[in-house]
């Protein structure tokens, strides 16, 4: 049975699942779908074509599905799709997509978005991610599963962050980050591997292989792209080579990499 506060303003066109809780002074628009077990604390605003997955909990003063902050947006149909078991904390803002992108903003399952996180239009975020307070994502960003982003970090539009990465707090990131890397700084560059996450997700032999692979990729000569091509030619069937090297070769913004920065950090860790 759903529990809905009397002061909540809910469109009769909204779809409300079973066991949904809606707190005081929430505002829910026409094209909202709340699946079973969703919990809205007080003063949550949901607008646009917004779909919230099961058991997601949204805290006070979050605004989801509001008009994209893009001057090119002219009111075209777009969506915000949020998966299951997410925690979206106070004052988060998440915008839907635009015609200039994929017309959707998508967030997976089991993510934690801490207070004041901003997710702009056309972003695609995986599952099991943690974004600390004040993280700001510009439009069209792609983020894989199991990514942690430290507080007050800003990320440029169209950046891609692959699975298992860690972005240090107060970073400004303008380039792509391949799988399992740690980046830090303004501008942020790769400092080493996210060994903590790798130990959670991978076997020891795979961690060792990836460590050696990155050392080969990040040599001063040949270039990073040439190194990635060579690795794919030499190890065409290895899943980690495919994942990492394909990501590098598909990068349009370039990879957040400096040979000296990576080498120095790796020496310290060893």
From Swiss-Prot:
Keyword Transferase: yes
Keywords linked to the UniProt accession: Acyltransferase, Cytoplasm, Lipid A biosynthesis, Lipid biosynthesis, Lipid metabolism, Repeat, Transferase
Entry's Gene Ontology BP terms: lipid A biosynthetic process
Gene3D superfamilies xref list: Hexapeptide repeat proteins, Udp N-acetylglucosamine O-acyltransferase, C-terminal domain
Subcellular compartments: Cytoplasm
Catalytic activity line of the entry: a (3R)-hydroxyacyl-[ACP] + UDP-N-acetyl-alpha-D-glucosamine = a UDP-3-O-[(3R)-3-hydroxyacyl]-N-acetyl-alpha-D-glucosamine + holo-[ACP]
Pathway(s) the chain acts in: Glycolipid biosynthesis; lipid IV(A) biosynthesis; lipid IV(A) from (3R)-3-hydroxytetradecanoyl-[acyl-carrier-protein] and UDP-N-acetyl-alpha-D-glucosamine: step 1/6
Tree of life domain: Bacteria
EC number: 2.3.1.129
Main location: cytoplasm
Pfam family, one: Hexapep
Listed InterPro entries: Acetyltransf_C, Acetyltransf_C_sf, Hexapep, Lipid_A_LpxA, Trimer_LpxA-like_sf
GO molecular function, one term: acyl-[acyl-carrier-protein]-UDP-N-acetylglucosamine O-acyltransferase activity
Keyword Repeat: yes
Gene Ontology, cellular component aspect: cytoplasm; membrane
Family note: Belongs to the transferase hexapeptide repeat family. LpxA subfamily.
HAMAP family documented for this protein: LpxA
Record note on quaternary structure: Homotrimer.
Functional summary from the UniProt entry: Involved in the biosynthesis of lipid A, a phosphorylated glycolipid that anchors the lipopolysaccharide to the outer membrane of the cell.
Name of the molecule in the record: Acyl-[acyl-carrier-protein]--UDP-N-acetylglucosamine O-acyltransferase
Organism: Helicobacter pylori (strain Shi470)
Gene name tied to this protein: lpxA
């Amino acid at each position: 049975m759903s529990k809905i506060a009397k002061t909540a303003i809910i469109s009769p066109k909204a779809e409300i699942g079973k066991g949904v809780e809606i707190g005081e002074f929430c505002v829910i628009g026409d094209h909202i779908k709340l699946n079973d077990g969703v919990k809205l604390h007080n003063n949550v605003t949901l607008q646009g074509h917004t779909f919230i997955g099961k058991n997601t909990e949204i805290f006070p003063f979050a605004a989801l599905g509001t008009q994209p902050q893009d001057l090119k947006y002219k009111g075209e149909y777009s969506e915000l799709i949020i998966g299951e078991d997410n925690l979206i904390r106070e004052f988060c803002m998440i915008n839907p997509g635009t015609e200039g992108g994929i017309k959707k903003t998508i967030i997976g399952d089991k993510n934690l978005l801490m207070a004041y996180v901003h997710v702009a239009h056309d972003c695609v975020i995986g599952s099991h991610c943690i974004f600390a307070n004040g993280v700001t994502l510009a439009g069209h960003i792609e983020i894989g599963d199991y990514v942690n982003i430290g507080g007050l970090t800003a990320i440029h539009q169209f950046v891609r962050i692959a699975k298992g990465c860690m972005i240090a707090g107060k970073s400004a990131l303008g380039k792509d980050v391949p799988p399992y890397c740690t980046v830090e700084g303004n501008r942020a560059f790769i400092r080493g591997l996210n060994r903590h996450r790798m130990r959670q997700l991978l076997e020891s032999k795979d961690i060792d292989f990836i460590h050696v692979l990155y050392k080969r990729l990040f040599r001063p000569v040949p270039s990073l792209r040439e190194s990635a091509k060579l690795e794919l030619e030499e190890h065409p069937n290895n899943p980690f080579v495919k994942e990492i090297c394909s990501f590098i070769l598909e990068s349009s913004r370039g990879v957040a990499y400096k040979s000296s920065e990576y080498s120095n950090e790796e020496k310290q860790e060893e």
